[in-house]
């Protein structure tokens, strides 16, 4: 075959010609891969060939390498191997193309990609000279291509072991330092070397205190040399080089400095050295600010972008060292620079004023962009005192004297917002005076007739931050809060600017964060405030897009939180809230934030609702819900965001039943059939998940007498969901449905229970979906909590794939317990497994499950692809032993979680401890960290005797468990230890010292 003809054919515009050529190329490769690879490499080498053909040759090699080069690739075909001498030729050609500075960029990039691919399987064993060639190119020619290639190899190929023990790290660092120290190396070469330094630092950051001394010494020496060189580089003057390159050079230096500061031990970067770099960083920030101030917007967009990127890296470094002492002069320099750098560009001002949605995205933190303002925010929120208090005074004073310079004023107000978000308290002399002047200035901005809308919007956002920060310092905080909120809302209602309205709505959430508005405003004014906010939401909602819709729902959620506690006394507000929930969410049903917030709003609206009001809302909503379901019948309920949203809303309505009874009959009458149809015909995973959840609540919260005639239809739905024709993901919520059916119809379905449970168990054993697995286990928890023996009897009565169901279920259950999270789910599993442990059943004693993972002990270096094909091996342990170990592990985890009550009483307890320290008659008995079983039992028996009169309720079924997880576990261990249940004594002896210590600390 002629390779040139195949390449031309494979690039043809005609689909048939293209497919024929591609097929022929693969067939040729299957018969003689070496010949094809050699032919493609020769085409890539030919400068007289067209660029397209050369590029296609490299793209073909890139694809074929994974199929014919080595079994190390997952897509390896093993039909024809590339011969060793051809491999050598290919490697040589690729390096020649990649390292040739005069080569076309596309060709260099294509060759580089192939090199990285091959090195992933060949380096270092089959390609030991790879790095030598690259190092030579860097050392002798300062090759940018070589440094770029080495960077890519570091990302994809070089392992930690290669870096430290294989000598690659040392060789690379020597090359990097050589390029950076050589005066004749170009600025571009130094930038490339600095990028390579970052790759090396990433490798070194994996080291820890337990590493060998040689690694520690290597890292320490490299970091010391790096810091020395980086400091020298910052002092270099490249007057004859373009500004953009100089700024990129500074950026990468500060990027490396930040990484060293944040990702390595403090001992490597002394405070004295940090101070020296801090001085240089402030100077560089001033220089960058000067460049920024003198750049015409139309002159150079790339220059402005580079200025802002460099600013971000410098401020990020200052943030990393912000715990150092800053002088007043240094702080003034930083504020002056950031005030200029954080000024909005004319383009941003135009975008925000013409489309308020972009403003909302940025202010709510949902915009994808990251700019110098964001980094300034990080800096100011990280500053400790006294710098924080100092900077507050400076910025407040600057605001007072900049009211006529609007661009500067907006920037200063933004910086003030950042300062106020710092968690530290702002203190110091004359703070009260500065605060009063600031509040007066902000008040003047609100009443001014000539202030531009961006300044007004920024002031509206800043005011609640000021009030929040100084809530304890302002004697008139309540009237101030009420007055400023009223002024902001009235301004927004009068204004025709959507920017002002949206800023006010965001600010409203800030007020809600620190103030209980119903208490601050009083019931009447609070209701008026709700009405105003609802009116503003209505005014902007028609033009709201994406992030703004989510923000509006968040505001609405806050509004609903202040609804009167009396049963729905203000119907106008409630109806308006309902209307907004449905209109905003239906405008953007694919928006995750909107869906989540709208559900939250609806749940709040339905809290403690009585039957009459519930029926009123159902009359409003139900017809539209059913219309959406019916309209999707024709396409078998194919996924759509609106259908999912409606199913979410239906679920909320069915879950939040009236507080004075079951769901009204109308719900069952009109919703049962549409939901049953969705569950009968849909093949969409998400649709089936949502519909199953709604259906479960419909059954659970409807009067059994009203639902009983539909029992056969319910069983048909259940049969489909438990069948293996429905995917694991789609059947995710079938567990709660089974529990709902068992709860409501235990007598009616008695003859079918065995079949249902067998289907549940089969589904549980087969499923690979964690959520589905955990929900199906809820059924077993339900059964075990009610009758553990009958549950074991049932599971012992049949087999799945020639293994008894009891063994399979217990293995699955034990594996699932380790990943279960969520308090209610953890509790039900603890109660159920506890019941099985107390049962002391011989059938359970015979079950063995996976214990600890057995580590690989061979001599092979296990690659990722090899690891995937090697099954994990575990020590096999008795079920009861594993239950104890799981419970100890859970107890250890839960005991480390902070307890609010303990936090509140910690000071009191500390006083008691201090008092007891001096008490010579202290009759506390010292307890060792780890107790043997007899000693443990002795302490517990004493404890049980003391608490014998406590009349604690027995835990049965799946009732609400008031005890915490820790209390449940402690009670379990006290009982099994005191009574030696199911051979606990023997199990205890097998526990590790750390496990015994957990029990000792928890029980005593």
UniProtKB/Swiss-Prot annotation:
Protein's UniProt keywords contain Nucleus: yes
From the UniProt record, give one GO term of the biological process aspect. mRNA transport
Q: Which UniProt keywords apply?
A: Acetylation, Cytoplasm, mRNA transport, Nuclear pore complex, Nucleus, Protein transport, Translocation, Transport
**Subcellular location, record wording:** Cytoplasm; Nucleus, Nuclear pore complex
Where does the Importin N-terminal domain lie?
21-100
Q: Name one GO molecular function term.
A: nuclear import signal receptor activity
InterPro entries, alphabetized: ARM-like (IPR011989), ARM-type_fold (IPR016024), HEAT_IPO9_central (IPR056840), Importin-beta_N (IPR001494)
Residues bearing PTM N-acetylmethionine = 1
Task: Write out the GO cellular component annotations.
Answer: cytoplasm; cytosol; nuclear envelope; nuclear pore; nucleus
Query: Subunit arrangement?
Result: Interacts with NAP1.
PANTHER family referenced in this protein's UniProt entry, alphabetically: IMPORTIN-7, 8, 11, IMPORTIN-9
Q: What does the UniProt function comment say about this protein?
A: Required for nuclear protein import and mediates docking of import substrate to distinct nucleoporins. Serves a receptor for nuclear localization signals. Mediates the nuclear import of TATA-binding protein (TBP) and of histones H2A and H2B.
Miscellaneous note, as given in the UniProt record, is: Present with 2940 molecules/cell in log phase SD medium.
Family recorded in the similarity comment? Belongs to the importin beta family.
Q: Which named protein is this?
A: Importin subunit beta-5
The scientific name of the source species is Saccharomyces cerevisiae (strain ATCC 204508 / S288c) (Baker's yeast)
Give the taxonomic lineage as stored in the record.
Eukaryota, Fungi, Dikarya, Ascomycota, Saccharomycotina
What gene is behind this protein?
Answer: KAP114
